[in-house]
Regions:
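Structural signature of FAD isoalloxazine-binding scaffolds in flavoprotein oxidoreductases
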Residues: 56-65, 100-109, 181
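A short, Trp-centered hydrophobic/proline-enriched beta-strand micro-motif
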Residues: 46, 95-108, 140
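Short secondary-structure junctions
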Residues: 113, 158-165, 181-188
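A short core secondary-structure module
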Residues: 125-159, 164
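Cytochrome P450 C-terminal beta-domain/meander region
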Residues: 110-121
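N-terminal glycine-rich flavin-associated loop
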Residues: 24, 74-91
Length: 361
């Protein structure tokens, strides 16, 4: 099943993620045909159980699809839609058609929810929501005045947005909520997977995406080094270039191992259906994955651009579709320093013996 789904996804991205589509996306043109193909393939509902009308894909397979979409630099909120749809279905809500996103995406932002007659009132300000107003609906994490974690699904066209973009020219809009009234059935208790917010889940999907983009960037560099000739021989024959590529490959391998471990443990715990105890145990591998992939992103992006020289900085060369995403994704849902500090906090709270057991098993 896994191989079939990945093969289907690869074919889809190869057919629909063209240079023209990517260039149009940089100019804020929504890739209608690509999104339609993704929806028709059922990929947007990959993490929605079959009994709820979804695909019910195993969690690790869903993450592999996310990784492949990042390899292709698909300019769509597939990862965000997968996770938001899966979480909303767990609350018993009906998953709407179209693209989804989620927020807040950092610890500094928060939304409060006050119960009102016939519904809820939401207040707060959220920065840099992925895809923001371009998505059809937004899954918002909020905390009630009683301290209960909640999720609310709100149509994006009813919200007050300020347009922003990241380095990859993807929408990262700012949302202002000032007494927004929503119906009672648009708000549900948050599943265990996101009771404390979306930061860990976001870090998990960004780590998978960065591995995909790292692989594509390294593919570009290896191809260029093999084809480009200087002083009568290919760049790959020069020892200095070989050392740079070896360094990049080493960081890619370490980042992949960290992301693979987080994906495997998340899948074994039940994915989005993981209970509170399992979610707490997943904090460590997710922190390691996000910190290590973020570190690799900066190093590998610098190396592959050095290998390409001036050619790699041109708009016409596809390398920037991978590296601009790497530079953006490494800072989203917590950068390296945040997750390195989280690793330290977890180690100190559990003691050295627990760390050794964690590393040795």
């Amino acid at each position: 099943m896994s191989a079939i789904v990945l093969e289907q996804a690869d074919r889809l991205f190869h057919e629909h993620v063209t240079p023209a589509v990517q260039a149009d996306a940089d100019r804020s043109v929504w890739p209608t045909d690509l999104w339609r193909a993704v929806e028709e393939a059922g990929l947007t509902l990959a993490l929605v159980p079959e009994h709820a009308g979804g695909f019910g894909l195993p969690p690790d397979d869903a993450l592999r699809v996310i990784r492949r979409s990042a390899w292709a630099a698909a300019p769509i909120p597939l990862a965000e839609t997968m996770v938001a749809a899966g979480l909303w279905s767990l609350t018993g809500g009906d998953v709407p058609e179209g693209s989804l996103t989620l927020g807040p995406v950092n610890q500094a932002d928060a939304i409060t929810a006050e119960r009102r007659a016939g519904g809820w009132r939401l207040d707060g300000r959220v920065r840099r929501i992925p895809w923001g107003s371009a998505a059809g609906n937004v899954l918002l994490h909020a905390v009630s005045t009683d301290g209960e974690p909640l999720v609310a699904l709100v149509p994006s066209d009813t919200l007050d947005w300020a347009s922003r973009r990241n380095l990859a020219d993807e929408p990262r809009d700012r949302l202002s909520l000032s007494g927004l009234d929503v119906r009672w059935d648009a708000v549900h208790p948050a599943p265990a997977a996101c009771r404390d917010g979306f930061l860990p889940l976001g870090a998990l999907i960004r780590s998978q995406q960065m591995v995909g983009a790292l692989e594509r960037a390294l593919d570009h560099a290896l191809l260029h080094a093999g084809e480009r000739r200087q002083f009568g021989r290919s760049l790959s024959k020069f020892q200095a270039v070989q050392h740079m590529l070896a360094e990049a490959a080493g960081h890619f391998a370490a980042a992949t191992a960290a992301a693979d471990l987080a994906a495997a443990e998340w899948s074994a715990a039940g994915g989005l259906e993981a209970g509170a105890e399992a979610v707490a145990e997943l904090a460590f591998p997710i922190a390691v994955a996000k910190a290590r992939t973020g570190e690799a992103a900066g190093i590998v992006a610098a190396i592959v651009h050095q290998v390409h020289g001036a050619m790699g900085f041109t708009q016409e060369h596809p390398l920037h579709y991978s590296t601009r995403r790497l530079w953006s994704w490494r800072d989203e849902f917590g950068g390296e320093s945040h997750w390195q500090a989280e690793i330290g906090r977890l180690v100190c709270s559990r003691g050295g013996a627990a760390l050794w057991e964690r590393l040795a098993t």
